[in-house]
Amino acid sequence: MSTVIEIASNKEIVTVTADSGKTAYDVADLMKRNRVGSIIVIDKKGQPMGIITERDMVKRVCFKNVSASRIKVEDVMSSPLITIMAYDSIDTASRVMTRNKIKRLVVLEADNRIVGMLSVSDIIKHLAKILLDDYDRYRSLRFAVDLS
């Protein structure tokens, strides 16, 4: 069975430090410049503590009619951060996402270092590949049976 680290996105993880004076406006700018839908919030020691997604920005800034340049990173982030270990199974990751009603999981190594991000899309692509591989094997077997 595949592990999380095998299918997690290998895009660069964008982070912002809590208590750095950064605002929701800064986060939106980071998201746009880096073409990402989420940013991990880390503490001063580099440990992950929260996440800011596009949805968080809409719910906590736009819908509340708050100026993005006045609201702090800590007030926008979702916390505590829900994570998955790099060598956990895809099945475990799917259950964690379903149970918590989230679309992304931060992937950690044993030392709590961020090594990737796993999204629902990553899991769907992985499952689609498995189905296509199985179908190709079936067709090969079917062809072999038809020849005999």
What is each PLM-predicted segment?
Residues S2-G21, D43-Q47, E109-D111:
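Short, charged helix-to-loop "capping" segments that act as catalytic/coupling loops
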Residues M1-I13, T53-T83, S89-T98, S119-S148:
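Tandem CBS (Bateman) regulatory domains
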Residues M31-N34, I39-R55, M97, L105-S121:
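A glycine-centered beta-loop-beta connector
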